[in-house]
Amino acid sequence: MEYFDMRKMSVNLWRNAAGETREICTFPPAKRDFYWRASITSIAANGEFSLFPGMERIVTLLEGGEMFLESADRFNHTLKPLQPFAFAADQVVKAKLTAGQMSMDFNIMTRLDVCKAKVRIAERTFTTFGSRGGVVFVINGAWQLGDKLLTTDQGACWFDGRHTLRLLQPQGKLLFSEINWLAGHSPDQVQ
């Protein structure tokens, strides 16, 4: 289990100066050719998403104005707060900020031939489904994960097992993504 606080994470500025990325985790760790990766991005200007052949991307707007996503002949979609949207990361997707407002997004990418991610929003205590990896990010409230207290802009990632996240207040929201491995694949096979 690895814990993080978004306010203390390293920030990587984009080459085109249109945004920045805070990488949460990758699997396998510290590998350029990852099977899955979670990050938080801030987008300050209209532009195109980076291409990642063979990957699926799920984007969830955390804060800021809505964002219009367009992929020629494939889709037009308005990204609304806390509504995950998945698309192939090997297609050109243009992002247009509405009302010029900067957005902050949670991104998870998975290699299509190896694993699949599912992103959800939780508002009550729950136990993960025994996936082989995942990420949680606290939107608001106080949550207990094992012996660790997580509050707004904090989270954790793991590479194995079931975990219970207990909401400690009457209200709270938590984004979580679980990674499930396709038949014939397992994190145990990765060196």
Swiss-Prot record:
Recorded hits in CDD domains, A to Z, give: cupin_HutD_N (cd20293)
Coiled-coil residue spans: none
Any Pfam family: HutD
Q: Which InterPro entries match?
A: RmlC-like_jellyroll (IPR014710), RmlC_Cupin_sf (IPR011051), Uncharacterised_HutD/Ves (IPR010282), Uncharacterised_Ves (IPR023482)
NCBIfam families on file: PRK11396.1
In terms of PANTHER family, this protein maps to: PROTEIN VES (PTHR37943:SF1)
What's this protein's family per the entry? Answer: Belongs to the Ves family.
Protein's recorded name? Protein Ves
